[in-house]
């Protein structure tokens, strides 16, 4: 494994990757802080705020670990030992799974929250945040159990040049597996992720169907006094569809690029594209949440006003 040849040589790829990580960390930090504050400050806190906070925190940690991995790819001399490699790479793989679990749980909770009173899902609307937290961490534990084999396969290979290892960073690689074990683990991974994505699609489709029927009923009853302004339910539905469509497209691209990388023996371009695409959702999705929720915009505006007042007061311009 000639790591000099495997490393991406295009400076634009490095800039794109580090920019994606930096922007994603900033956006998820803002989203996490805003929803956490709103959850504790509002008189009637919404469980969905806690779920979005979970998602943003997961994506924040995912991008931080990706930043460490990128630093070892481009700026390190292969100084990580096996313990460091296993800890960081395994934790990064787990966070990718946690991100999928959190996104799936968010879509399900969103459907419960927006369901009309006549829906069979109404009884789930007022579940406490404790139930939401338990569901999230249960999914995470299952993912940890299913991914535990990766901790054994990740080793430090800073001085090895074998073509049998799968390159990860300058310091770390993944040990080769037999065809049967590779097939088995791949089948488990595909089944697990296909199940979660199917749940997301099912609940998103159910929500869209309910809101479409509700819109038809409203048009029938108030055909002469329709407003061109979209309702909060319609805006939420568009957000759900946008996030769901974006997630599925990126997931398909992720699979195609990963398979291409395997076919072309760890080509540097495919490896770089795989990293960028697989972290695009974590970078872009917080902007969708921020700009689709007026509460966050108002909250950020009020926080900016407080910071400006504090700065003016500390400089002696206050009363």
From Swiss-Prot:
Pfam families: V1R (PF03402)
Subcellular location: Cell membrane
Family matches, as InterPro entries: GPCR_Rhodpsn_7TM, Vmron_rcpt_1
Keyword Signal: no
Cysteines engaged in disulfide bonds, as pairs: 85-172
Gene Ontology annotations of biological process type: response to pheromone; sensory perception of chemical stimulus
Known glycosylation sites: 159
TM spans (from-to): 20-40, 50-70, 94-114, 135-155, 194-214, 239-259, 270-290
PROSITE patterns linked to this entry: G_PROTEIN_RECEP_F1_2
Cytoplasmic side: 41-49, 115-134, 215-238, 291-319
Membrane topology: Multi-pass membrane protein
Signal peptide: none
Keywords for the protein's UniProt record, in alphabetical order: Cell membrane, Disulfide bond, G-protein coupled receptor, Glycoprotein, Membrane, Pheromone response, Receptor, Transducer, Transmembrane, Transmembrane helix
Gene Ontology molecular-function annotations: pheromone receptor activity
Gene3D superfamilies: Rhodopsin 7-helix transmembrane proteins
Cellular component terms (Gene Ontology): plasma membrane
Function comment: Putative pheromone receptor implicated in the regulation of social as well as reproductive behavior.
Similarity comment: family membership: Belongs to the G-protein coupled receptor 1 family.
This protein's name: Vomeronasal type-1 receptor 96
Gene: Vom1r96
